[in-house]
Amino acid sequence: MKGGDVMYLEIGAPEAEPVTLEEAKRHLRLVDTIITEIEPEEPGGEPTIITSHPDDDYIKNLIRTAREWGEAFQGRSWITRTVTAYLNEWPSCPLKLPMGPVQEVVSISYFTLEGVEVEVDPSTYWLSPDGVLYGKGWPFAPLRERLGVKIVYKAGYGDASAVPMRCKQAMLLMIGHWYENREEVIIGASSSGAAQIPAAAEMLLYQEREIPI
């Protein structure tokens, strides 16, 4: 392990999912069967008709789980969110920030032996287009024993429209797999008849998979 390796990550939740509930239901070929009529707020107005499916909440959970699975498999962030990385010491070489693509560094700070957080001057570091952090020279102040360096940055492709289609398709494959197979599954060939993780979903995500060095 090199000096200044990322030791802990806090990954914020995205504001939306790459795949909508309606897109997932179309992939599953589900038709809404519940019709809800909401009375108008103004007298004489038209009622609002809302349709839904009994499994809507379950499918929403599958959407979130499929996105989390895909991001973990690739080691990347798909929808913009805030990521906070903690290091035990300053990087001894340029640092590849995890869970990219990295859009911008929001702040870098460190914690003194007394636990006081001090922000670093932004002019002393910069970010390359491939998400590598460079520093002109890090502060010499002694750090607290653990997680003394804190890096906050924005990561992700953007909103849902910016997420690559292969990522969305991998999500849909996993959503369909989990919807049809709600019990334990296995990876690889088996004669027991147990369901398998769809290899196509992984193949779609291999292209930009981050492999830690």
Regions found by a protein language model. Name each.
Residues 1-213:
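Divalent metal-cofactor coordination and adjacent catalytic microenvironments
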